[in-house]
Amino acid sequence: HEIEERAEWIRYGEKWDNIVETNDYVKQYPNINVHYSPVMSIFNFHRLPEMFLYWQDKGWIDKHFNIILPAEPGFGTNADFKFLPYEFKLQTKEKLEKFMKDEVLVVRNQPLANTISSLITSMIDYNDNSKTIRFKLPNDSTESTSLRVTRSLEQVSWDINLHDKVRKAQFSDIFPELNFLKTTK
């Protein structure tokens, strides 16, 4: 499954089966409240709706597992979602706002909506000093767009290319919509 492959790539060395086993074990005890706090990054912020629906389909989000508060990456993290291209940020914003408006989750709490709104604002408003390159977004085959490349994105690109050399899984196969991150030099 796509969610599983992505999670194993992001948390290299972690086996998805261990995550499933732990969540299924804890799910047996209705007296336990589980808090999910996924750290948002370049690799997963745009996929938040799919992640939440996957967790809900697995039974990990229900009336007992109902506290979800996505977290920003720590200061100095190279893979901060704020470094995404502006056009990609706008697509992500639209997707997340629609997801929250449609209320497809059994979890309908204001803290989750406020947190996602705050993360979107933080992402859109972020500005820095950087150079610009041109590339095509995956959903737009005709027009190129620009990517403001920071040292952090250069490091992400370097890391991705290194991981592709040593891992069995290739970044482009797992994150095709983010393949532009491999070419930010």
Segments (PLM) and residue ranges:
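Radical SAM enzyme [4Fe-4S]-AdoMet core and its adjacent flexible, acidic
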Residues: 1-185
